UniProtKB/Swiss-Prot annotation:
<feature type="active site">
    <location>
        <position position="332"/>
    </location>
</feature>
<dbReference type="GO" id="GO:0006526">
    <property type="term" value="P:L-arginine biosynthetic process"/>
</dbReference>
<dbReference type="GO" id="GO:0006541">
    <property type="term" value="P:glutamine metabolic process"/>
</dbReference>
<feature type="binding site">
    <location>
        <position position="289"/>
    </location>
    <ligand>
        <name>L-glutamine</name>
    </ligand>
</feature>
<dbReference type="GO" id="GO:0004359">
    <property type="term" value="F:glutaminase activity"/>
</dbReference>
<feature type="binding site">
    <location>
        <position position="246"/>
    </location>
    <ligand>
        <name>L-glutamine</name>
    </ligand>
</feature>
<feature type="binding site">
    <location>
        <position position="45"/>
    </location>
    <ligand>
        <name>L-glutamine</name>
    </ligand>
</feature>
<keyword id="KW-0436">Ligase</keyword>
<keyword id="KW-0315">Glutamine amidotransferase</keyword>
<feature type="binding site">
    <location>
        <position position="290"/>
    </location>
    <ligand>
        <name>L-glutamine</name>
    </ligand>
</feature>
<comment type="similarity">
    <text>Belongs to the CarA family.</text>
</comment>
<feature type="domain" description="Glutamine amidotransferase type-1">
    <location>
        <begin position="170"/>
        <end position="357"/>
    </location>
</feature>
<keyword id="KW-0665">Pyrimidine biosynthesis</keyword>
<comment type="pathway">
    <text>Amino-acid biosynthesis; L-arginine biosynthesis; carbamoyl phosphate from bicarbonate: step 1/1.</text>
</comment>
<dbReference type="InterPro" id="IPR017926">
    <property type="entry name" value="GATASE"/>
</dbReference>
<feature type="binding site">
    <location>
        <position position="249"/>
    </location>
    <ligand>
        <name>L-glutamine</name>
    </ligand>
</feature>
<dbReference type="InterPro" id="IPR006274">
    <property type="entry name" value="CarbamoylP_synth_ssu"/>
</dbReference>
């Protein structure tokens, strides 16, 4: 079955269709990860996007029940050079092709993914549509140019609060499109976690008596989530806070800094990040299309703690007065290296120190 990818600039790439037979539009992006395709297609941060894999062969170890990062996949489509029809792995339960058919997610194989990746790198992220061969190219292009993708966080966030009990520190995890890996890392440390929707107010969060607040990853432009920014303005300084990815960007906006769209984003499993204080370099998993503007941090109470070695963009922030820090990358990995996993320990240490300071103030009062 032939299928085509039509881009907003009029480019048409023809290949072989796989997966669902539906037509889908989305922001066409690329990821450089050689593995981790199951985590990618189930990562809510990819909501509304058509993901191109730069590695030439995808699907060779199939799909299993353990490696999902959310219950429902959020991608609008997959593009690969070659899809493996006969996966081989002891954990394999279903092929990638069959899984995408079940979930009605379209895929495109047999195109020059290097050519497509170079185009995105040169011209920036493009809107595109995976469609049948009889599609009207001119009409599709006009529709793509007029399309604005919004409300991604609303689509992927939990609708209702729910607990993930533990015996340790109580952590309220604000779900902007949370990867399960973040929750797993908190559970490993026996945290008593309450997951809440993206639009939960500061008053509602504080009513839960949290020891700490975790801001999750999520899709899209952080400025599309004004209710979260307002919530953070009322939260910062009252409870220890740790933010990841979109949570990092929202924290920056709430603190007076600014964010902007990257030309083609950071998506992959091997992005080097430098800790400014120690000089240590961590290889990190990343998935974001926006970043905090470095110059906008200067007139705030924030300090930059980490930078990307590939392009110098801001990768970490810390508040100068209050117990709060954030990173742009994914310390929970899933998939990817675990170089930055100790940030979860730093978060718990910050909570303990904040508690001790509060106890000392009470004793001295």
């Amino acid at each position: 079955m032939k299928r085509q990818l039509i881009l907003e600039d009029g480019t048409v790439l023809i290949g072989t269709g796989f997966g669902g037979e539906i037509e889908k539009s989305g922001e066409v992006v690329f990821t450089t990860g050689m593995t981790g395709y199951q985590e990618t297609l189930s990562d809510p941060s990819y909501c509304g996007q058509i993901v191109t894999f730069t590695y030439p062969l995808i699907g060779n170890y199939g799909i299993n029940r353990d490696d999902f990062e959310s219950i429902h996949p959020s991608v609008n489509g997959l593009i690969v050079n070659e899809i493996c029809d006969h996966p081989s792995n002891f954990r394999n339960e279903i092929s990638l092709n069959d899984y995408l058919k079940e979930r009605n997610i379209p895929g495109l194989a047999g195109i020059d993914t290097r050519k497509l990746t170079r185009k995105i790198r040169q011209y920036g992220t493009l809107r595109g549509r995976l469609c049948n061969m009889d599609a009207d190219v001119e009409y599709i292009v006009s529709q793509l140019k007029a399309t604005v993708f919004t409300d991604h966080v609303k689509r992927v966030s939990t609708k209702d609060p729910y607990p993930s009990p533990g015996r340790g520190h109580r952590v309220v995890l604000v779900d902007f499109g949370m990867k399960h890996g973040i929750l797993r890392e908190l559970n490993k440390r026996d945290c008593d976690v309450i997951v809440v929707p993206y639009n939960t107010t500061a008053e509602e969060i504080l009513r839960l008596s949290p020891d700490g607040i975790m801001l999750s990853n999520g899709p899209g432009d952080p400025k599309d989530v004004p209710e979260a920014i307002e919530m953070l303005k009322d939260i910062i300084g009252k409870v220890p806070l740790f933010g990841i990815c979109l949570g990092h960007q929202l924290f920056a906006l709430a603190s007076g800094a600014n964010t902007s769209k990257l030309k083609f984003g950071h998506r992959g499993l091997n992005h080097p990040v430098k800790n400014i204080a120690t000089g240590k370099v961590a290889i990190t998993s990343q998935n974001h299309g926006y970043a905090v503007e470095e110059e906008s941090v200067e007139n705030t109470e924030l300090e930059i703690t980490h930078v990307a070695l590939n392009d110098g963009t801001v990768e970490g922030l810390r508040h100068k007065k209050f117990p709060a820090f954030t990173v742009q990358y994914h310390p929970e990995a899933s998939a990817g290296p675990e170089d930055a996993n100790d940030l979860f320990e730093d978060f718990l240490t910050m909570i303990e120190n904040f508690k001790k300071e509060g106890e000392e103030l009470c004793q001295n009062a």
